[in-house]
């Protein structure tokens, strides 16, 4: 079982325990202890389908962005696959910056600079529509 699945399972167990033990001291999952101290955006990235990362979204406070390779057989190398499905380092940076823009931490101009710097084509067809 991968770490993501263990994190989700443990968070579900804690949630269940808290529901059926309302008068006892409520437990906190590892995800909550690790990520919920501050309400900051989380960007979860996987070479698997986006839904794999989305499994932990309900247990993370703050905005949550999942990137994943929702398909296969589209590229000859892992690098090309990540670029095609928009999960390479450039899209990760852009997603993180955009999350900070949405939080009001940085200005939209920073996202525009990232798009320009990394030659991200905003007219590129969405990978899930191809």
Question: What is the role of each PLM region?
Answer:
Residues 4-130:
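Thiamine diphosphate
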